[in-house]
A protein has these predicted regions:
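Phosphopantetheine-dependent thiolation modules in NRPS/PKS and related acyl-activating systems
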Residues: 2-44, 49-82
């Protein structure tokens, strides 16, 4: 995924939600970071993030919650509703 092709608003929204859920500063988050392996999100934080996303109309199925799920994957979900 090219960083240039990604909507900056969607990226900002996702990185700020991640910050709210687990405290990693948005400036330290890359689209290529794995939520589990790189950002060290635990299962409770992942569910919190899913709930925050659902509040803004974005659905990520629990079956997608693997250690391979990246910030960029979440951004693509957000972009798909706008």
């Amino acid at each position: 995924m090219s960083d240039v092709a990604v909507d900056k608003h969607a990226t900002s929204l996702v990185t700020n939600l991640i910050y709210q859920v687990n405290g990693v500063l948005p400036k330290d988050i890359s689209l290529h970071h794995s939520l589990v392996n790189d950002l060290l999100m635990d299962s409770i934080e992942l569910i919190d993030l899913l709930m925050c996303l659902e509040d803004i109309g974005v659905t990520v199925h629990e079956s997608e919650l693997t250690s391979e799920l990246t910030v960029g994957d979440i951004v693509m979900h957000v972009e798909s509703i706008h």
